[in-house]
């Protein structure tokens, strides 16, 4: 639900970097973003293809960087990683810690964590700069838990 809402408002050039343990819902969040961007059809984690691009309201690159640890900049360029961060596209990166130096400075960081007493719940922590503040804060405020 939150992923879909953000996808409906995601501006061109936005990059979201999602980190969290296995099973925390990174791919489920990507599916919500894709729905919000008007992308029909299945969205799956591109674990072995590294990058999957979809067409919706805006082009959407879904990156799974889990297997990209230690790759050099030239190798990442060969698979089209830098193309995902063009201003006309949107991008969602799972396991961003493996390619952090290659992400744009204004990347929105999302951390997904388990909630100990509620195993089916997730805590979502967003970190973003002032560029994202104007469009993102009004969307997240109703979900803020004090």
List the predicted regions and their residue ranges.
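Hydrophobic anchor at the beta1->P-loop junction of P-loop NTPases
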Residues: 16-18
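Conserved post-Walker A coupling segment in P-loop NTPases
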Residues: 14, 40-44
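Conserved lysine of the Walker
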Residues: 26
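Conserved nucleotide-sensing/catalytic segment adjacent to the nucleotide-binding pocket
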Residues: 42-43, 53-95
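Pre-Walker A adenine-sensing motif
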Residues: 1-9
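Short phosphate-coordinating micro-motif centered on Lys-Gly-acidic
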Residues: 71, 81-146
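The conserved Walker
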Residues: 22
């Amino acid at each position: 639900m939150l992923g879909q809402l953000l996808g409906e408002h995601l501006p061109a050039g936005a990059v979201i970097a999602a980190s969290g343990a296995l099973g925390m819902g990174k791919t489920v969040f990507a599916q919500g973003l894709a729905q919000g961007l008007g992308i029909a059809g299945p969205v799956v984690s591109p674990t072995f293809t590294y990058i999957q691009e979809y067409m919706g309201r805006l082009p959407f690159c879904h990156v799974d960087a889990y297997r990209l640890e230690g790759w050099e900049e030239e190798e990442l360029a060969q698979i089209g990683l830098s193309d995902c961060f063009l201003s006309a596209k949107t991008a969602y990166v799972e396991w961003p810690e493996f390619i952090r130096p290659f992400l744009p400075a204004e990347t929105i960081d999302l951390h997904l964590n388990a909630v100990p007493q509620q195993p089916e719940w997730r805590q979502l922590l967003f970190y973003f700069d002032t560029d994202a503040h104007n469009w993102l804060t009004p969307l997240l405020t109703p979900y803020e838990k004090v």
